[in-house]
Amino acid sequence: MSPRPSEHLLHLLHTHQRQRHFISDQAIIDIASQLKLPRAQIEAVTEFYSFFSRKPRGKFDILFSNCTSCGDLTLMQELCDKLSIKACETRCDGQVSLTDISCIGMCDHGASALVNDRPLHSLDSKRITQMAALIEADTPLDAWPAEWFEIDDHVQRTDLLLSTPFEAGSALQILAQESIDATLEKIRYADLRGRGGAGFSTAKKWKFCRESEGETRYVICNADEGEPGTFKDRLLLTRHADSVFEGMVICARIINAKQGYIYLRGEYRYLLDSLETALSARRKAGLLGNAIVGLEGFDFDIAIVLGAGAYICGEESALIESLEEKPGIPRIRPPFPVTSGYLGKPTVVNNVETLAAAAAIVLHGGHWFRGAGTWQSRGSKILSISGDCARPGIYEYPFGVTIHDILNDCGAEHTQAVQVGGPSGRLVDASHFEHRIAFEDLATGGSLMIFDDSRDLLQVIRNFTHFFAHESCGFCTPCRVGTMLLKNGMDKVCSGHATAHDLDELKSTAALVSRRSHCGLGITAPNPIRDGLKNFPQLFEQRLLHQKMEPEFDLDAALEEARQIAQRDDAEAHL
């Protein structure tokens, strides 16, 4: 049996963390007793996820984004100085704690942070000073300036999905009027491919799951948008949630699932209440629960489980492990989730954008969708654009748009590189800006980070290697050790202490990590270094230490002391 969200291990840990500011030994004992799980399992889960702490955090728990695109840790240091606290520590009076974390999905708003799970953005020195005063005065967050917490969608360009109105229940009314096979054929004809970056056929995935043995099946929405520089799901879950929900219901109808889950990233906790309210409204309207849209036997419901700050849980099998109340360590595949997923049952895992697109296809038809894009990449792609540009935000384009056109639209100037698909993607130099966003060219889950000529690209690459070393789940040695070696290697390059030999070592380590790692994190972790060496070799050469650094040992000189003791200096006493 799957646990109710209120009884899920992650939910209980979140509750204790918020109430007590840490997970105590007694909390672990109580939770283990309540869930009838081994204490060791509770401890393992607590230690795996960065949002849980075994040591007390502050009443004001502040997490600064260190994202390469928008992070500004000098502001965190300013706040540390004003509050008389060291980074990554809790002040002795328990009032405040500060640390840095990976991207929180606010890259279009500049420097940002989470304060007790609520996002603050557009941070500058003035606001840091104001924050420090409010914290010292013990002012509740609800009494802080409301505009600090207001989030602009920053929708800069719309196309197929975002420009088409979607009314709750509209796709389900059509679903009720056609056969299951006809609905699946719509998805197949539209040639919808997964929007997470891998691009697997959505219709095939649903068909494989539908044909798998077993009566119980599950639908999971992967809303763990953890790739640095990505924030499109934030928009979809706030302004277009009904299309996402209906995509899940449509999938459930096709594969005959009764239960679905939204795995929401911990950094988006502030969206939880609005999503729960929307789900309740759908139940009241007959769009969720029993006999959906009046169809007897069409029963399906959705629950939300909140993640806890583990990037690896964006990988579908790690996400499933997390849903099963375990550390989010990727599984060995095969079997794939469509045959053995959540609780060992056939499971479909799709990301937010894929499900929203599926609902739109059922509503408007396959012709409407496949008319946009390229022959291998149908439809549109929603992009999160950030970094050095005048107009960061959400841009939706038909597949096939060039990097050059995107840079023009967002007001980017003097661009030296674009990171497509987050740190695990491609670092593209100016000579390749005519390449296109498409599965057959530049595939991306939705992140584009722009770097102009004022940026030190080696520091950008270094930050990416630090990100992967921090986010490795530690399961396999090539990734656990290899990402640390890559991090140390880039530290050496950026400090000006690396030699040509060190670069050779960096290349061979990158190849080994990519070839031998257990999951996609390790496989793609070397990408920033490899792309950097390929596209910007001169930057590495300029930082090299051009002197002989090989270890040497003069054996004859080492024997000098022995010769003096023996009072010998003849030819046989020398080498």
Task: Write out the residue ranges for each language-model feature.
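Feature of Fe-S/electron-transfer and energy-metabolism proteins
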Residues: 1-575
